[in-house]
């Protein structure tokens, strides 16, 4: 168990529920998600996603936001099944049961930031093209970015950038 409370982000499966920050005192708090939880490490972001180990067996709803974030942050995971049920995001400490804080900048991006735009690039070295849609949340932008990569073969790379709110 950790010696101090750490900041985590809950990503609810139900899209209408907002992401929220939580304070966890240790691994037992993660186990409140389910009787048996499994980690999904996202090394590029130094975080771990925890979810119900029996997510599909229990017919839990797909977690589009967590699945999109994993696919955007870890391109190798794009061929893996979607994540289901609520997902708890914690800082990765390199240990199986020790947990750390989600990086502060990432908490801001996920919970407090926005709006965001998605940019695409056809080939390395080519100019980036800003797509016309503005997304209120980072998770919405990540979903759109992954769709661009999967459904538009001319797109070789995508990135998400925080942008200014459109003038009213």
Please report, for each region that a protein language model flagged, where it lies by residue.
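Short, extreme N-terminal segment that most often corresponds to the first beta-strand
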Residues: 1-19, 24
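Short, structured protein-protein interaction patches enriched in aromatics and acidic/basic residues
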Residues: 45-75
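Short aromatic-glycine-(Arg/Gly/Cys) micro-motifs in beta-strand/loop hairpins
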Residues: 108-129
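A short, charged, amphipathic alpha-helix used as a generic interaction element across diverse proteins
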Residues: 30-37, 134-159
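Surface-exposed beta-loop interaction hotspot
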Residues: 95-115
């Amino acid at each position: 168990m950790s010696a101090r409370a750490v900041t985590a982000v809950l990503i609810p499966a139900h899209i209408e529920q907002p992401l929220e920050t939580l304070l966890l005192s240790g691994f037992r708090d993660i186990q409140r998600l389910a009787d048996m939880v499994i980690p999904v490490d996202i090394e590029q972001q130094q975080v771990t996603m925890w979810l119900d180990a029996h997510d599909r067996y229990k017919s839990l709803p797909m977690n589009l936001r967590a699945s999109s974030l994993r696919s955007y942050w870890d391109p190798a995971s794009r061929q893996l099944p979607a994540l289901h049920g609520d997902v708890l995001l914690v800082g990765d400490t390199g240990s199986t049961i020790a947990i750390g804080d989600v990086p502060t900048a990432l908490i801001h991006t996920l919970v407090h930031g926005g709006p965001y735009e998605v940019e695409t690039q056809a080939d390395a070295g080519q100019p980036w093209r800003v797509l016309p849609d503005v997304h209120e949340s980072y998770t919405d932008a990540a979903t759109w970015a992954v769709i661009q990569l999967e459904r538009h073969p001319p797109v070789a790379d995508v990135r998400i950038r925080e942008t200014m709110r459109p003038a009213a």
